[in-house]
């Protein structure tokens, strides 16, 4: 069963990819969807056996690298962390496959699309089930390649090409960090197996642990789109909407957080790295929330909400509360997939229009989609008793319960981010469903609600977005839960969950919720009562500057294009002049060219004309005679003559 969880997505991807022309579009739909649904059911069984019954499973397939210094095998582990990750990965992937059968029905490349989706899922499964860092790295790279193929699925679109290349290049930075981290782990521990590395981590020098932790942080920042390496995530919206749902909810961006969760036995002994992780997460959450407030593309608004929520996950990992991070990661998958698929339903109904300014008045025309979008947005805002409430507010409370300088600051940053999250969620809902109709008339004339095959995944995700957090709260973050066993490690000195639960002032617990409600009513008041206020504010010089700053994403793209590219071009020029210029000129190519040129010139002296040879003899004689004037001692001149006339005779005798 456990091997089937891995092999079924790979089998469906292979069949749809290589036999797509034989089985057709319907056959590809049937094989990929049935395989993913079956795999999701097996994941539920695995969650029951491993997570609830406490029976972890380890599988060793075969030896991969067997040398004197390194032993790596194709091994897979199913513990509480793995099966918890399998739930969002496989359930969301199965629902996305079902949803895509109708959403992508008119596309001529259905077989390729579903093959890519299944391959994406397979590599994510390899990433979360591998029992050593090298197998994880294979899945890590596979997820990156699959995301490139899916973002660039419509490869005739220039923007899709740029977005895919951007995603690949930005993730290369994270891959660089992971690669160095792998070498550092091998050099430090002599092994890449999780059990060996984690057992030895408490006895390793803290400086080495910090270096390894920072390398893993860089890797996670690239894959999970943290500030500085986040610019690829909004541009990834150029791919089909089901791809966006899969990338943002279950795969790709969660890989970086999973790396931190799996490496918790290492991170816990690198205090400096934990502080860095906390601040990276807090700054990302604040940055993404403020940026999403003034975006005009529906999918980009949701993309920045993903970036902000990932920042909260990093924040709580830096606070060493890995169980809360896993809980919010799973919760986030449900309502984020619901938001993206609901947005896809709106875009599908409005003739592929994505601009919020060209929507409006859709609540009466798309009541079902409107209901789904409201559920997803309220769960994202952490409205009480929805799924997001049980984990998101707990993260913010833990920041204050850390009782440190960093903890207090990141608490306020996260609280402000929560306020902006509520504001851009309500803004996107209002502009899409409640405002005045602003789109072309033809879009409204042809509008249609999502068909049944697209509605079923939305209903399932809505149920998870409402009830999952309440049902599983005690399992994931309850006091004294033994769900994790040894899958996660929290140093006893870093355990603050009990203090936060019972020792935090009630005012600090309610502050994020009150701020979110104030932000909600503030946005509604601006659009319903003071509807002219936004236009008046933007018409001022200060308003234009603020709007442009947030709308242009803090000018990160401009900075990279105008400043970073200059350094890269300088490096390219230096490489071209030195490595491929001066070094080659005086190196092998230069020597070969010098000898070739000299030999060509010497061979050109052989003209075949007797007068030319007579001139050579005469010039040689003149040169020989002039040596008398340069050699002061006549005995040296006699010795020279003797050498000239006797050397040929010696050669002849031999």
UniProtKB/Swiss-Prot annotation:
Residues spanning the membrane: 1-21, 30-50, 76-96, 113-133, 135-155, 178-198, 200-220, 241-261, 274-294, 301-320, 324-346, 365-385, 406-426, 451-471, 510-530, 612-632
Pfam family, one: NADH5_C
EC code: 7.1.1.2
UniProt-annotated location(s): Mitochondrion inner membrane
InterPro entries (alphabetical): NADH_DH_su5_C, NADHpl_OxRdtase_5_subgr, ND/Mrp_TM, NU5C-like, Proton_antipo_N
One annotated GO molecular function: NADH dehydrogenase (ubiquinone) activity
Membrane-topology descriptor: Multi-pass membrane protein
Reactions performed catalytically: a ubiquinone + NADH + 5 H(+)(in) = a ubiquinol + NAD(+) + 4 H(+)(out)
Keywords assigned: Electron transport, Membrane, Mitochondrion, Mitochondrion inner membrane, NAD, Respiratory chain, Translocase, Transmembrane, Transmembrane helix, Transport, Ubiquinone
Keyword Transmembrane: yes
One BP annotation, GO: ATP synthesis coupled electron transport
Cellular-component GO terms for this entry: mitochondrial inner membrane
Family the entry assigns: Belongs to the complex I subunit 5 family.
Function field: Core subunit of the mitochondrial membrane respiratory chain NADH dehydrogenase (Complex I) that is believed to belong to the minimal assembly required for catalysis. Complex I functions in the transfer of electrons from NADH to the respiratory chain. The immediate electron acceptor for the enzyme is believed to be ubiquinone.
Protein name as annotated: NADH-ubiquinone oxidoreductase chain 5
Organism: Rhizopus stolonifer (Rhizopus nigricans)
Gene: ND5
